Each structure stands twice: as C-alpha cells, then as structure tokens.
Amino acid sequence: MEFPGSSDNYLTITGPGHPFLTGTETFHTPSLGDEEFEIPPISLDSDPSLAVSDVVGHFDDLGDPSGVQDEGFATQYGVQTLDMPVEMTHEVMDQTGGLLGAGLAMDLDHPIVTPYSANPPVTIDVSMTDMSSGILGHSQLTTIDQSELSSQLGLSLGGGAILHPVQSPEDHLSPTPSPTSSLHDEDMEDFRRITAPKNIIVEQAKKPKTPKKKKKKDPNEPQKPLSAYALFFRDTQAAIKGQNPNATFGEVSKIVASMWDSLGEEQKQVYKRKTEAAKKEYLKALALYKANQLSQVAVDTVDLDPPAVPALLSESPVPSPSVVTATSIPECVSSPSAPSPPSQTVALPQQSIAKIIISKQILPAGQNPTSIALSQGVVTVIPATVVTSRGLPLAQLQPSPQAQRVTRSVLQAAMQMPPRLQPPPLQQMQQPPRLQQMAPAQQPSITILQSPPPLQPMQKVRLTLQQPPPLQIKIIPPPLQPQPQAVQVQNQSLSVINVSTSPEAPASPPEQLEVLPEVVQEESPPPQMDVELVSSSPPPSLSPQPRCVRSGCENAPIECKDWDNEYCSNECVVKHCRDTFMAWIAARSQGTLATVK
C-alpha cells in the first residue's frame, strides 16, 4: 500500500489472505529519522466483529477504564484506532500542569496524510506516563483527535500537511461522551484559557501611531512685513475697484502688475523704503518676542511652593551675612562732594542677571538652598524686571501671600548660584558705624521694591533705617538704557537691605549719589519675614510721530485696520489712490504716444 502524497514510503503487509496484521508482527518505515516507533496494528476496513480489546491487548501494562465504552463506539461507528505509547517527561509540562511549552512534539521528516478522509476520524490512544503534576492520572488513556493534537499540542510533522477529517470527533462522540473525551475537553479548555492572555498582550503591544499635531501659531507673534509690490497693490486695488466694480481679482491683478511695471523708479523707492522700515521693526519685534518666550519658560519653572519664610535666616544664625540686591542700575561713580561713606568701585566681568534664575528641574539633588545661603553669607535677589516683564500684574505683587511666594521662590533660585558667579560691577558702600549696634540674632523683615525702568548713569540712592524692623534703600532712577549693577552692604553682625523704589518719584536729571544712613538702635526681631516685590513697567521709548502716507498731508494717521494706520482719513485714501492711478494713466499714455510717433 502506498501513502498518498509521497513516492518512496510503502507499508508492506505479510501473510497472504489476512485482512490485518497479528499482534506480534511489526513493520518498519524507512526515512523517518533516528527514532524507531513501535506502531500497533492498523485495521484496514471497518469490521463489526473487531473489538478494541484485541488491538489494545498488545500493551499489557495499560489499563483503560473506558474500554467497554470504546468498544461500543468502535462497533457502532467503525472508529479506526492507533495506539501509541508516548513517554512524557517533566520538561513537556507547563508550570501550571497543562500540556504546554515544549509540549508533545513529534518531528517527522516526511509528510503523512490520512488515507481515509471520508471515513470517521482517526483516534490515537496516547498513554500518558511519568506525569507527576499533570492533569491526567498515571497510566490513564485519553482520546485525542489528530487535528487538535497538531494544532493545540504542537505536533510538528516536518513541514508535511495533514488532511483533517470532514467531521470533528465531538460530532461523532457527542451523543454519549466518554470520561476520557470529557477529560480531554477540560485539557483543551485549560489550554485555551492559559494561552488567551498571551494573545491579548501581543495585541496590546501594537499601539497605533499618534499623528503629529501641527504647532498652532501664536497670535502674539509679530507678522511679517509686506513687500513693496504688496503695498502698492493694497493702495491701488481700491481705486481700480471703484472704477470697475465688476472686475475680477485676476483682472485687477493684471492691471496692478501693469501699473507697477510702468511706475517710476522714484515712486517704487517710496514703497521699498516702507518695506525696509517695516522689516527692521519686524526684526526688533521678533527678537523681543523670542526673548519673552524664553524668559517666560524660565519663570514658569520656578517653584512656587510656600516653604517657611523665617527658615532662610533662623535655621542657623551666621555672624555676618550680607544681602546682595541685584538691580537694573547702571554703573555709578560716587562724586567726592557727595556726603557718603568712603566708597570704591570694583570692576567685575559683565554677566547677565537673568542667568541667576535656575529652573526647578536642574537644581542639584538633595541640596538645601538655605544652607548655601547661610554658609556663603550672601542672598541674591533677582531684579524685578525678570518677574514683572513676564506679565505679572502689580496687583499680585503687593504685600500678599502670593507676592511673598513669588519673591521667595526667586530668592531660593538665586541662592543656588555657585559662589564663583559674581554679580555685575558692584558699588560697595562701607557700613555706617551705627549699624554695628544691631544684634546678630535679630531678623528684621525684608521689603523688596524694585523699579525695572532703565536708569541714568547718575542716580539718587537713599539708605534709611526706620522703626519697626525694616531697613529700606530707596532708589529713585530716571529712565534710560540699563546697565546691570548690584549694591552690596557689608555688615559685621547682620545687615538686611530693603530695596524700595518709590513709584511716585518722577524722572529726574542726573543727580549725585547720596547715602543717608538713619539707624534706630533699638529694634526687636519680628515674628516673621515679609517679602514683597513691586515693580513698575518702563515707559515707552519716544519715537518720531508718524504722518499720513498721502503726499502733502501733515496730519497724523488714525487707527484703521484696513489701511494699517497709514492715513488720516478716508479722503486721503481716495486722493492717494487717485493720484497713483492718474500717474499710471499718464505714464501709459506717454508710452502710447511715443509708440505712435
């Protein structure tokens, strides 16, 4: 007999006239690998007189409690059986006791095809022995269908195909299921239950790619300036539309292009100059916008958590800490005639005050800001321009818990600066003699009032010590270009500086530097430290007043979105467009006459 699907595998049956092999005869199939399989007899046709006990009798050590029931199945349905002893080891058992993992694997080099696809399914009785933690008991038989054995238990047939039966064994055995088949169903159910979560995990691992979101344009970003031709087009299209109301945009564009070509070089230069001026303004506005964005990020990352304010000075008293207030003050040189203590100017490398701001994420881990401040004896205060120029209203910076938290966070961020970073050029003033009478343990409240407007090179500084505790330094600056400077007051015992800017002080011409120390000897330490940060916005810089675009008009333009605030009235708009259009017609008519001549 030849197996379908192959050309070199034959099954030789000895003994003429016998419908099946006896129990003592075996056969050997070549080219099946290194293993030898002892295969029990195979019945070639369905014989009602054949009992399962005759076939299973070859294995004396096996006992099937359901043998009588299987005999009934064989008699009624003519089930073809294949008994095969398979030794199971602990390696084929999963940790849960099911037939998983390496499983029952039979690697056959050649394809095997069931020759009776139309007959009832082939049933393999596999003896499960040497199983300590399995579901089946010792020496107990189970009925496994060939298709489920290959799909569920990993029966690898060396690349060959298996023709599955037309009907499943459940269809044949459903009327009277045997104990072994029900046990097999439980095995399959456990296998599916265990393998189901693995499939879910694989599906969850594949996440769809999120589409990239387009960055929204900031409405505060300055708009790019128009070109010279765009300005000309904007000025002339209204006049063309007035004369030809039904003209389409394409026709208007052609007319404007022709007018631009025939326009004189001087008139073109007018528009080009406008474009250049608009470009310069755009670049300035763009630079300010980008700087504002970067500094806004730095201010947003400052920690606004409210730690205890008195801990800055009360944690470990230091004999002589000094408070360095970094303000936007140009470098000052005290005049010899000014009634001030001996002073000297120390030149240090220029550094940006904004660099003192350190975001919360990059602070050194486990570093206490108060310990740094007290060990070095220096507390650096960020200028008010850094905070108020970022959109913080003055109402929030009044003496309130919010203002204290903002200023305190700025102080803590400033204290993280390494000692080698020094502020810009300092104006050091010697301590007045009466300041030494203050006790080291006293902690007056700090009031920080700074003015961000630019200052004149010469300014008036008034140092006053008032009662109750606070010390105040009043800086009255007239507005001009800023140059960073810090005022440092050295104190042997304890010196707390309150920098207050009098907002009501008007801008004044350059004045001498005056330091007027007024100290109250008896001061009691306050219960807590009040920190306030108040700042005013700088006045806008003066610029030449714009004029109306129409030639000959000296009036100032009015605010109008349609004409970009370039005309003083609608009459000027019409006159300007009419003059431009008439100039174009005149230039065109001259060109036509020249061509006719």
Swiss-Prot record:
GO terms for cellular component: nucleus; PTW/PP1 phosphatase complex. It comes from the Eukaryota. Residues 207-217 have a biased composition (Basic residues). Component of the PNUTS-PP1 phosphatase complex. The keyword Nucleus applies. The gene is tox4. A motif (Nuclear localization signal) lies at residues 212-217. Keywords: Chromosome, DNA-binding, Nucleus, Phosphoprotein. GO terms for molecular function: DNA binding. Transcription factor that modulates cell fate reprogramming from the somatic state to the pluripotent and neuronal fate. Also acts as a regulatory component of protein phosphatase 1 (PP1) complexes. Component of the PNUTS-PP1 protein phosphatase complex, a PP1 complex that regulates RNA polymerase II transcription pause-release. PNUTS-PP1 also plays a role in the control of chromatin structure and cell cycle progression during the transition from mitosis into interphase. Transmembrane segments: none annotated. PANTHER family: AGAP000281-PA, TOX HIGH MOBILITY GROUP BOX FAMILY MEMBER 4. InterPro entries: HMG_box_dom, HMG_box_dom_sf, TOX_HMG-box_domain. It is found in: Nucleus; Chromosome. Residues 222-290 bind DNA. Residues 160-224, 520-546 are annotated as: Disordered. One of its GO terms (biological process) is RNA polymerase II promoter clearance. This is TOX high mobility group box family member 4.
